[in-house]
Each structure stands twice: as structure tokens, then as C-alpha cells.
Amino acid sequence: MKKLVVLLVAALAATGAASADAQKGGPVTVLTGGQGVVAPDGRVRYIALTTGRETIVSFVQLPGGQVHRWRQLPGYFGIPVIALDGTTDGVSGDGRTLVLSTPSGGVTTQFALIDTKTMRLRRVTLRGTWSYDAISPDGSVLYLIQYKELGPSLSYRVRAYDLAERRLLARPIVDAEIGERLMRGWSVTRKTTSDGRWAYTLYARAKKEPFVHALDTVRRQAYCIDLPLDLERPDQMSLRLALRADRMLEVRKGRDTVAAVDTRTLVVHKH
């Protein structure tokens, strides 16, 4: 316990560095400290603290806030940040797998996967700039964003990594109607279904309308849904998503609903 306290003090002193490093020409991809990420059942919050050389992942009970377990791992890792509004992710729908990532921008990108029951640790290392996107409900497939160009002309592909076979699947995850073109835009906000199967991400673009990227993490399929909204990019950045019980995905600007997507048919209704 004494060792844990010493490491926590050192990690708290370094908190925030990962987010700062991730902003150097690329997307914000990890969070250390802060709110961490909550398990799908709402009973545990996972918070990563790093000294730079080591990372401590605290398992915090909810409600109450007591640290009841922790996992130490070598290296600099954080909870994945998947959108500019600060949305975090990284827990599979069944709650068994927690994903952490190194900041993007290095020669390689590493991902650490912790089994939340056995505490077993696995690592995935890929050359180039990558970030976490999603994980299948059973924790068998990791979805990653492979960046081709950073900066104002940010471009990327979504790729799938089979964790059982420990290999990156050759074909990108794309909308079949669009083909294997590079995606462009900035992820603004995300909503995920309660079972962890569908991840809906709203992207802003500089000279085009915003769009929703709908990722089916079970069938390894994606759909790009253009939103008929005449908004400049700063206004697109203020949009938020809300999932209704009737499976409608609302696009909101402040308190107003400006569009809605029927997630069963992918038809967009402008308000």
C-alpha cells in the first residue's frame, strides 16, 4: 500500500501531460486523471494516472469513490478520448476489457488491454499514428483510427484488430457505398448504445456539412450519414448527440433538435 501511495503522488504531479502532448499537431487521444471512464454497468470508474515511466489504473467503486483495486503497468498510458467534447471510452460492453493508449504522434502507438476480472495485461503495438475508436461488446475486436495526415487536413481510416488472432485486418472498415476513400473531419461527440454494439460519432468538416459515422462493432460495418445542416465548422463543433428510447439519434444545437437519424433505416429527418 505504501508503494501505491508513493506512485499515486508522483502520478498526480504528472497528470495532464498526456493531453498536452497529444495536442501537438494531432488529435487529443488520451486522458490521465480527470473523470476517467465508467464501466457500462455504472459500478466502476477507471482512472489512469502516470508518472511518465509507469501508469497506475485505479478501479474506483461507484457510488462511494473507494479505490478497491489497482493495476500498475510500465509506460505512459491514458484513457482514450474519442471526441473533442472530452468523451472518453475504452470499456467493452460486457465490462471485461479496459483499453488504454499511449498518446498519438510517436513512431509507434501502443495499446494496453486489461482484463477487469483477472487483471491480465495484453499489449498491441503498431507503427505510425493511431488512436482508439471502439471495441466490440465481447472485447474480441479492437477498432482503431489510422491517421494518414495530421493538421488542418486531417485524414484517416478505421481499422479492425482481431485480438484473438493478434493481427490487424487488411481491409479498412468503410461504408460500402462510399468505398475505401480516406475519411476527413474532426470527431466532435459520440453516443454508444447501452450494449456497446453501435458507436455513433458526429464529425465536423471545414467546407462540407457534418456527418455521423455509425459503426457496428459486431458486424464490422460502418455507415457515413451526411446531415443536411448548413453550418460553418465552429457551429458544427457545438453539436451534440442524444439517443432516444425509440432508437432515434437526435442532433442537438443547444436545447434545439436540428436533425434526427432513424438508426434502423439511417434516414435523416431535418427539424
Regions found by a protein language model. Name each.
Residues 47, 100-101, 144-145, 201, ...:
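Residue position within the beta-strands of beta-propeller blades
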